[in-house]
Amino acid sequence: MKAADARAMSADQLKDELGNLKKEQFNLRFQKATGQLEKSSRINEVRKDIARVKTIARQKAAEAKA
């Protein structure tokens, strides 16, 4: 996910996306533990996407207060 895509989302959509990313991260960790993970770089991509979504959600919340 690109930052521009996340910025275009509403706060509710960001929450939904964050939930989806956390579920995906859990599944990837589970696959890694069981030796079924084929694309290990996806773990880092998802981790960075989670950080990106959290950052943008926080920025939007700060803008709403100001």
UniProtKB/Swiss-Prot annotation:
CDD domains attached here?
A: Ribosomal_L29_HIP (cd00427)
**The organism's lineage?**
Bacteria, Pseudomonadati, Pseudomonadota, Alphaproteobacteria, Hyphomicrobiales
Has the keyword Ribonucleoprotein been applied to this entry?
A: yes
Pfam families to which the protein is assigned, alphabetical: Ribosomal_L29
Q: Does the keyword Protein biosynthesis apply?
A: no
As for family, the record states: Belongs to the universal ribosomal protein uL29 family.
Alphabetized PROSITE patterns for the sequence: RIBOSOMAL_L29 (PS00579)
Q: Highest taxon of the source?
A: Bacteria
An example GO BP is: translation
Q: What is the designated name of this protein?
A: Large ribosomal subunit protein uL29
**Entry GO MF terms:** structural constituent of ribosome
Q: Which UniProt keywords apply?
A: Ribonucleoprotein, Ribosomal protein
Point out the gene that encodes the protein.
Answer: rpmC
Q: Name one GO cellular component term.
A: cytosolic large ribosomal subunit
